[in-house]
Amino acid sequence: MQNIHFIGIGGIGISALARFLKEKGFKISGSDLKESKITKELEKEGVKVSIPHHKDNILNKDLVIYSAAIKEENPEFKYAKELGIKCLSRKEALPLILEDKRVFAVAGAHGKSTTSSILASLLDDASVIIGAILKEFGSNMIYKESQNLVFEADESDSSFLNSNPYLAIVTNAEAEHLDHYGNEVSKLHHAYTQFLDVAKIRVINAEDEFLKNYKNESIKLYPSKDIKNCTMCIENFKPFTSFELKDLGEFKVFGMGYHLALDASLAILAALNFLDIETIRTRLKNYQGIKKRFDILHADENLVLIDDYGHHPTEIKATLSAAQEYVKLGGYKKITAIFEPHRYTRLATNLKEFAKAFEGVDELVILPVYAAGEEPIELDLKAVFPKALFVEDIKREGKFLVASKGQVFEEGLIIGFGAGDISNKLRQKNE
């Protein structure tokens, strides 16, 4: 089985799998609906990418792997089935990809990309497959001739149950993606239990409402007791968080916010099973953050422009707390949040929580909902966010942002939130 075709190869998670299998020696091709930064990068790396989908793209392929966004009526998927080509979802393909590896898997509703990437910086002999771009490597995949592999495991489609972890970290088990679990929290929690039970080594946030009751042996982090003297600073506009962990001394990590200390602590406790504490302390300094997580696109004395992937109230609240600290340390005038809601169902379910999350900002700008394939739900957002400015679009002009209604945003800390298209709106072509 040499020729593998990926349908939906432009996705952040599936592109990492494609890159990994290419490094393992397979001949990789892929397709997507439209060109993107990821598809262009893949082409530069030698992957044949076809835009848009067409049934002929799967001719002479031994295996087809498709993303969760691909429907049965997709022309490539349908034709592959007709020709009898083996088709695997991303979830079904994981055992094939991870089968011979010692997997260090990180799961959780929030913080898994950050925790995975910090762990990858600490375990520098491991391959890495995550759903975000590691800034120090410029990729979502690192291939090493090693048995070890750091993997960001996804609970949204229960694919984390196919990751066969040697070591499992769970950052938290807050209810997200419940539609996949029949809207039953108990089913989601049962899946987390299964994920942890498989692992030889388990590291958990023991103050999470569900995880605190986990019965099997595990390494437990109690953030309120174990993380002390958490402080933040800015060096040349770069954010850093310092903290003390248990009796292990002080650590300093790139990024801003208490949640960074929590994610780093979980990674440190996991790495302690394989490395001495001073090696961990030193390697932690190599971590440079991940793209779209408090990602500073421009910074000077008057203006800071930040791109953030936060699309759930819990994430937004934590990131805005970090933003307030940055504003205080840097002496900036105000905070402007630009919010592109992601999925109607998430917005409808968490409307009150979103309103509360944005309470501390000086200005709130709201873009149209990024539907991600969902049918629209009628919502009176102006009643929920009475002080917000609603605009159809926003674009970057130089270091400033200009809204479709003509407003210019040019001072203070400006932060964009969303998992849809907002990142492209905030960035210039070279960012």
Swiss-Prot record:
Gene3D superfamilies: Mur ligase, C-terminal domain, Mur-like, catalytic domain, NAD(P)-binding Rossmann-like Domain. Keywords: ATP-binding, Cell cycle, Cell division, Cell shape, Cell wall biogenesis/degradation, Cytoplasm, Ligase, Nucleotide-binding, Peptidoglycan synthesis. Its EC number is 6.3.2.8. Pathway: Cell wall biogenesis; peptidoglycan biosynthesis. It is an enzyme of class 6 (ligase). One of its GO terms (molecular function) is ATP binding. It catalyses: UDP-N-acetyl-alpha-D-muramate + L-alanine + ATP = UDP-N-acetyl-alpha-D-muramoyl-L-alanine + ADP + phosphate + H(+). Its main location: cytoplasm. It is found in: Cytoplasm. One of its GO terms (cellular component) is cytoplasm. ATP binds at residues 108-114. It comes from the Bacteria. One of its GO terms (biological process) is peptidoglycan biosynthetic process. Belongs to the MurCDEF family. Cell wall formation. This is UDP-N-acetylmuramate--L-alanine ligase.
